[in-house]
């Protein structure tokens, strides 16, 4: 995009508290409870979301740490306006005692008013998550 005087960067981040674990429950959104720095986006920890204020191409990243208590697995998907983006997912699984980070970054064309969240689409066994983050940066 354009740079120079008068061009403000557009970005936003929302995270969860470090070390606070949440149970992975099917068809719920990841709990993002701490608003981070933002400019040109709306951060809402009450509904675990980032809203896009300016149409454009964005780098969208999410990262979540899972702690597997028993043989378990989980699938996460980005949602846009509560619509699951099946092509944008991460998977994690394994035996008891495994800690795994589930993360990805995508470039997406987003519209003003789009609301982004991360949803737990599948979860089996005993699995908890923590240290979650969702970050958007407008690149064009």
Where are these regions (language model features)?
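Extracellular jelly-roll beta-sandwich "head" domains, especially the C-terminal globular C1q domain
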Residues: 2-140
